[in-house]
């Protein structure tokens, strides 16, 4: 995991993510806390957030980090492509990607994981790191598990 966090640190985050209360207002707070916990673990220079499906596009949801792109079309950039393919996409070096949408010049690597609730795609978990980074299969599995926990908090 290079300069960010090790897999044990990440796995401990899953224990800290609360389950749904059934109340959208309470769950929004739980969702924000889960993203904050991941952001702090990865380091202050990271960006962690959600893009949520709304009216045929992905709109910026709760996040931790610098201001970000507010709307991303399906199939565009890493986030939109992740949603279109419905599979995780890990980019070691974003400068090597043709259709990369640069929302933060500090981002050097990115991983996106689809969020699915009750069989329906509802969004994308997006994580940007400030260094070129190879994402291991262990990390990808962690982020998939994190996305499942996040799906439980979405209403």
Where are these regions (language model features)?
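Short amphipathic alpha-helical segments
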Residues: 26-30, 34, 74, 138, ...
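Sensory-domain boundary capping and coupling elements
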Residues: 116-129
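Juxtadomain coupling helices with adjacent low-complexity linkers
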Residues: 18, 129-155
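Intrinsically disordered, low-complexity terminal regulatory regions
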Residues: 1-63, 67, 154
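A short, aliphatic-rich beta-strand micro-motif
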Residues: 109-116
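Short hydrophobic/aromatic beta-strand element in the GNAT-like acyltransferase core
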Residues: 47, 112, 124
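Regulatory sensory and allosteric helical modules in signal-transduction proteins
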Residues: 45, 52-103
């Amino acid at each position: 995991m290079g300069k960010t966090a090790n897999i044990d640190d990440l796995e401990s985050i899953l224990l800290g993510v609360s389950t749904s209360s059934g109340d959208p207002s309470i769950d929004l707070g739980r969702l924000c806390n889960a993203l904050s916990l991941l952001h702090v673990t990865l380091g202050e220079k990271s960006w962690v957030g959600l893009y949520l499906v709304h009216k045929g596009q992905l709109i910026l949801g709760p996040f931790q980090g610098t201001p970000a792109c507010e709307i991303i079309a399906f199939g565009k950039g890493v986030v939109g492509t992740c949603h279109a393919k419905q599979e995780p996409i890990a980019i070691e070096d974003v400068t090597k990607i043709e259709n990369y949408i640069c929302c933060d010049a500090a981002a050097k690597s990115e991983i996106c994981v689809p969020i699915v609730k009750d069989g329906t795609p509802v969004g994308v978990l997006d994580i940007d790191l400030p260094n070129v980074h190879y994402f291991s299969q262990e990390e990808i599995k962690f982020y998939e598990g994190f996305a499942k926990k996040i799906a439980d908090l979405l209403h």
